[in-house]
Regions:
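C-terminal capping region of solenoid repeat domains
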Residues: 1-7, 11-12, 20-23, 128-130, ...
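LRR N-terminal entry segment and analogous cap-like coil->beta motifs
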Residues: 2-62
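Leucine-rich repeat
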Residues: 8-18, 37-45, 64-72, 91-99, ...
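Conserved hydrophobic beta-strand positions in leucine-rich repeat
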Residues: 23-25, 48-52, 74-79, 101-106, ...
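Alpha-helical adaptor scaffolds
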Residues: 51-70, 76-98
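A mid-sequence interfacial segment
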Residues: 83, 97-110
Length: 161
């Protein structure tokens, strides 16, 4: 899908948002444009779980999601198998919208050591219990940053490289 095209996001949301607040749009290839459109949908104000794996979302799409006031109720954010780098991890780490987030799944991206360090320094993500960074090439230093972070006080499930 090109940068200017994305599926009809509003209709996808209306069809796929459950009464319980879960939106599963995995493998829809919505890209950064679709992520930005999602971020602007007031319909998602009560969403608690956002499943966006395999969607070709990069750092600018992540930035849009992170700046959305409509996603502040999320407890689960699944961005597995996208195109997220250290910059996207930094957006996530600095976003003030994730105070309710319990699970962050970023496996199969490219955040690297630098991205892991951004997450480890986050003052916002301290309440998460699950962090999945499998296959992100974070290396020993990135893994150490996550494991030794004083900010992850509730972390009980961690999956690293």
């Amino acid at each position: 899908m090109s940068d200017n095209e994305s599926p009809d996001i509003k209709n996808l949301v209306l069809k796929n948002l459950t009464d319980g607040g879960t939106l599963n749009l995995e493998n829809r290839k919505i890209g950064d444009v679709g992520a930005a459109q999602l971020a602007n949908l007031e319909t998602l104000a009560k969403a608690t779980s956002l499943e966006l794996g395999d969607n070709e979302i990069g750092d600018s799409g992540v930035a849009a999601l992170c700046s959305s006031s409509y996603l502040s109720q999320l407890r689960v954010l699944n961005l597995k198998s996208n195109q997220i780098t250290a910059k996207g991890a930094e957006h996530i780490a600095l976003s003030e919208n994730w105070s309710n987030l319990d699970q962050l799944i970023l496996k199969f991206n490219q955040i690297g050591e630098e991205g892991a360090k951004h997450l480890a320094k986050s003052q916002v993500l301290g309440q998460i219990s699950t962090l999945d960074l499998f296959r992100n090439h974070i290396g020993p230093k990135g893994a150490h940053a996550i494991k030794s972070s004083p900010n992850f006080t509730r972390l009980s499930r961690v999956r690293l490289d």
